[in-house]
Design a protein with these regions (language model features):
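Alpha-helical membrane-targeting segments
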Residues: 18-41, 105-115, 208
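A short, well-structured juxtamembrane/interface segment
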Residues: 35-62
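Glycine-rich anion/phosphate-binding loops
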Residues: 130-138
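Catalytic core of membrane glycerolipid acyltransferases/transacylases, capturing the structured
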Residues: 17, 57-130
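A cross-family acyltransferase "interaction/gating" segment
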Residues: 109-110, 151, 159-230
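A cross-taxonomic marker for long C-terminal extensions/tails that follow the last structured domain
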Residues: 144, 220, 227-250
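Short glycine-rich anion-binding loops that position phosphate/pyrophosphate groups of nucleotides
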Residues: 69-71, 157-160
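Residue-level preference for the first positions of well-ordered beta-strands
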Residues: 62-64, 149-155, 190
Length: 250
């Protein structure tokens, strides 16, 4: 299938393409390795998180990776983190929800595709009603990819936190709907929260120094509630703990 233009008007073709798109795993690993060499995050684990994560990835159990969103470089920090954690084994088998603006420039589009990107049309750009159908289809595709054995990485705040990067913004139910749709199809994903901090002097979405971020990997959450909003509440609490860990370790 030819790669479609990523526009809201074309959302059905967009999600038909990303339902099956899979990047070259070798090239993806090279890209992630280069991002680690550039960004070199300093990774800290909760007590048994590293061993549990290694076992999960080895077993093939699918993960929803939730990370906080404080700069325009977070996706690169997260990719660099994946390279230097047990998540390395999942490179090429992880989808990343990414705002549609990242798919406009052809070169950036290619790079985001290499990272496993799936476009998201955000209500803050188009309005809630305009993106409703596209949003439902995006959640269906995301759940389907989980059911096929892919992991899913999400920045569930939805937009950069420009107020207080130490405190999460409100997390809506979208991540919960994706997890529930996967569970309804027989696959119960495990939540993995990853907190990111660029230090007390980092302000705004484009701080001067985004290298050597402090990254905190929480212990996986195996049992999620049944209702989407309840899942979102669990994510809010668990991800805040990860953010606290990243801030403390900076």
């Amino acid at each position: 299938m030819d790669k479609p233009e990523v526009t809201l008007e074309n959302y059905e073709a967009v999600y038909a393409y990303y339902r099956d798109h899979r990047q070259n795993r070798l090239l993806a690993k090279l890209a992630y390795a280069s991002l680690y060499a550039k960004y070199r995050p300093r990774i800290v684990y909760a007590d048994d998180a590293k061993a549990q994560l290694a076992g999960l990835v080895k077993s093939g159990r699918v993960l929803i990776v939730a990370a906080n969103h404080v700069t325009h470089s977070d996706q690169y920090t997260l990719a660099a983190t994946a390279w230097n954690t047990p998540l390395r084994r999942a490179i090429g088998r992880t989808r990343v929800l990414a705002k549609d603006e990242l798919f406009v420039d052809p070169d950036l589009h290619r790079k985001v595709d290499m990272m496993g990107g799936i476009p998201v049309f955000r209500s803050k750009n188009y309005g809630l009603r305009a993106v409703a159908d596209a949003g439902r289809l995006m959640m269906d595709i995301s759940a389907e990819r989980l059911c096929r054995g892919d992991n899913l990485a999400i920045f569930p705040e939805g937009t950069c936190n420009e107020d207080d990067p130490t405190r999460l913004q409100h997390i809506n139910s979208g991540i919960g709907h994706i997890a529930k749709r996967a569970a309804d199809r027989g696959v119960s994903p495990v939540l993995l929260s990853i907190g990111i901090s660029y230090g007390p002097d980092a302000h705004g979405p484009d701080p001067e120094n985004v290298k050597s971020a402090s990254v905190f990997v929480s212990e996986p959450v195996f049992d999620l509630p049944a209702k989407p909003m309840d899942i979102a509440h669990v994510v809010q609490k668990d991800l805040q703990i990860a953010v606290d860990g990243a801030v403390a370790a900076y």
